[in-house]
Amino acid sequence: MTSKMENNKDESISTKNALEEKSNETKDETSKRKHDPAEEESAVSTKVSKSEPLEDKGNAEVKEFKETTKSNGVKPEVEITESTKIQKESNTEPCISTGGKVEEKELKVNKDVDENEGHVAVETGKKESAAKPAASVSPFSQFASFSNASSPFSNVSTASSEPKEEKSAFGAFASSKSAFTMKSVKDSPFKKFAAGTAVETESGSGKEKENDKKSSENFDELLANTSAKAFENQKGSAGETKSEPKEADKGSGDSTKSTMHQLSDSEIITGEEEEESIFSVRARLYVVADEKKTWKERGQGILKVNVPKQRGSGSGRLLMRNDAVHRVIMNVPLFQGMSKKSLQIASASSGGSANYLKIFVIENGKSVLYAVRVKDNSLAEQLRNHVLEAIPKGGREDA
């Protein structure tokens, strides 16, 4: 591609130089003609009458142009052919392109119509174009050499031509000529068979209609008979069903009575039925663990001081249940011989409120230390006094 571009550039430069030389020669000749009025008259004073046809005018102009060029010794830049004649008639002229090559453009023909004389003075644009300087080539147009005139595709006609319809490769296999096209059904044996079946279906449809009528009549008779029998059966069954609800009502009353007996309250035995509580208070219970000797919380609930209803029949006890599940968390008997030292009021820390009651008891042959925390000191003293009252008499009263 680069070599082709360079060749085209060289050709354009050479053609440009040749055209510049020719234009300079024509300038010199025109300057000479200005000094010779006889030559100017012979070159330009050709007049053509209006009655002549257009073809004669074109031929006359071409002849005059050739004579003037021969007399002056100037070679025409473009050979006059039949195409140039047509261009003159269509007011076209050749001009110089930016790439330095000759393109076919419109010939500028100055037609000055003189209304008084009624003729047309034709001056070829060849002389004017020769006098004009050549157009300068732009240094930035690198693709100027690829003009329409110098293009290898310039010979190809760009005239609007209707695109030819491409014949399909499957044209031979058209539906009319295809081996797979079905033959007409007119002459086929299938048509006769179809016609015969149609006649049979028509005759068969008539028989089916008659059978349908008979079956419908039979169905109506059966329906009437069955409906009468069913009505009689319903009457008999209705009389029997009237007596059944009475028996059902009796059974339902018995069942309701039995359910009432099942929902009766049941008594829960707690072991406190023969006891009465002389004092109760809400408290939180702590116990000393055997292994680590630290206080451990057992839970909170209501602490009761219970004594037997019949005094002297038994001993009292301290009973406490957990609020959540009512599990017994303290059940300490008050035996005879308990001293006051086993019940001591204390505080959790020095300077704090004395709202704890420490109780030292024996359970299952082991000594256990409890601590009951109440709201304030007054409740702790009341609890201690009631516990001392519940201890059976005959015990030691040590201070």
From Swiss-Prot:
Phosphorylated. Pfam families: Ran_BP1. Its main location: nucleus. Residues 1-173, 191-269 are annotated as: Disordered. Residues 256-396 form the RanBD1 domain. It comes from the Eukaryota. One of its GO terms (cellular component) is nucleoplasm. This is Brefeldin A resistance protein. SMART domains: RanBD (SM00160). Residues 253-263 have a biased composition (Polar residues). One of its GO terms (molecular function) is small GTPase binding. It is found in: Nucleus. Keywords: Nucleus, Phosphoprotein. InterPro entries: PH-like_dom_sf, Ran_bind_dom, RanBP1-like. Residues 138-157 have a biased composition (Low complexity). GO terms for biological process: protein export from nucleus. Residues 1-31, 49-69, 101-130, 205-217, 241-252 have a biased composition (Basic and acidic residues). It comes from Schizosaccharomyces pombe (strain 972 / ATCC 24843) (Fission yeast).
